[in-house]
Amino acid sequence: MKLLTPAQLHRLCVKEHYDIEVSYLEGPSARVISGCQDRTTKLVSWIHVEQHTMDRLSGSFRSESEARKCYDRFDQTVCVSQFVHDDFCRILNFRNPCRVLYNTVESDKILASASCDAPELMDDGRLRLMAVGTLKESKGYMRLLSILKRLRDEDYPVHLYVLGVGPLQQEMERYIRENGLQEVITLLGYQTNPYKYVSKCDLFVCASFAEGFSTAATEALIVGTPVCTVEVSGMKEMLGEHNEWGVVTENSEEALYQGIKDLLDHPDKLAYYKEKAIERGKSFSTENTVHAVEEMLLGGQ
């Protein structure tokens, strides 16, 4: 792609005139859409993840200079969280219109799916913890398993369910087996309807080393499941700077362990955060998020 200029790529890929053109991913698609030469077309760029460095941000472009020029051509840049927004603007010293709009999820469909039965979940009086996502290193699953071992050893009545598949699965299974955790950790694999499981758990847990604006945590709030998470991009926006709608700890195994343990030690606090999850989940309804995007696309800057 770098052999062609953005304008050449645009002529090759986009054959019609459009009133609005959207680059919904950073990098290559932004390079293509920025090549639009029709000044009557509104150009919009979406940024989903923190880039951290100019090298990473400009990796799909010929140079740092080209990356700056391409992003400067957009009439509106949209970031999925304040963390992503601040990171993007810092790297580019960006002064063009740039706003935060949260990802749209199908809240009505999620709530309907959440009502289905989930017989795989044990009804034995133990608190159910839930983690969701690809089984890979960046999701922090090994430290979450370590936390469950500590809780088991301290006789806390908990059971962790994990939804997802991925390259870390064999290592996780080996750790569970070697530490005798089969009775307190269940890997559910990939499920077409994760919501029926999340909605019936007492606490959603995120141990990730890095995230964008977590769709899984958003969906947990929508179905009314409290969230306890390490601090990654977007979580304080979602749950409050002072834990108004959920618990955000520093990004370490010990801090997450203490956060979960505190909720287990104080059932009234867990019940409080369930109410807050329901309240906060309404902010991410399809109606609200779609309206915000429509307003951005059809309105002014």
Residue ranges and their predicted role:
Residues 2-7, 20-40:
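An aromatic- and histidine-rich active-site surface loop
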Residues 7-16, 60-77:
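Membrane-proximal helix-turn-helix segments that form the acceptor-binding/catalytic region
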Residues 83, 104:
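Carbohydrate-associated surface elements
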Residues 127-150, 167-173:
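A conserved mid-protein helix/loop that constitutes part of the nucleotide-sugar donor-binding site
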Residues 173-189:
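Nucleotide-activated donor-binding/catalytic signature segment of Leloir-type glycosyltransferases, i.e.
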Residues 190, 209:
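Aromatic "clamp/platform" in nucleotide-sugar-dependent glycosyltransferases that forms part
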Residues 226-229:
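Short hydrophobic beta-strand element within catalytic cores of glycosyltransferases
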Residues 241-253, 262-267:
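Conserved acidic donor-binding segment of nucleotide-sugar-dependent glycosyltransferases
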